[in-house]
Amino acid sequence: VVPLVAGRVSMVGDSVMLGAVDDLGAGLTGEVVADAAVSRQVDVGLDLLRYWRDTGYLGNSVVVHLGNNGVFTDQQFDELADILSGVPTVVVVTTRNQYTWQDEVNDVIRRGVERHPGVRLLDWHAATAPHADWLWDDGMHLRPEGAAAYAALVAESLR
């Protein structure tokens, strides 16, 4: 087993996380490594987390925000939990988007958190419900105030 990097927060996400990348260190101590990419699919994020784990690059806290760009299955959530099984703090973020799979993805995430008690939920979907002003007109990507709120919620979820 490769040791984790103490004091490092590893984050993997898509363009929503990318929109907050400049704010993600706010309220956090230690090193923040965020790898967020436009149109990232769940399987690519899982591959990255597996690579970080296997090479000793993974922090002792991990935040995952995937599922905006396609389905996230129960099997993939279980795989995620398995990859991160030795990580003391794991947070998975729900999605907010205009796609038909949004509710299915969020249900998978909520069920996964119930199945894996060591995984925490950051319910971005619920947090954004009263704050349409945090998002651009596409209902998904972050305005500056949304990026600040996202970063604050991420920091809070890690405490």
Please place each PLM-identified region on the residue numbering.
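Short conserved AdoMet
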Residues: 57, 85, 114
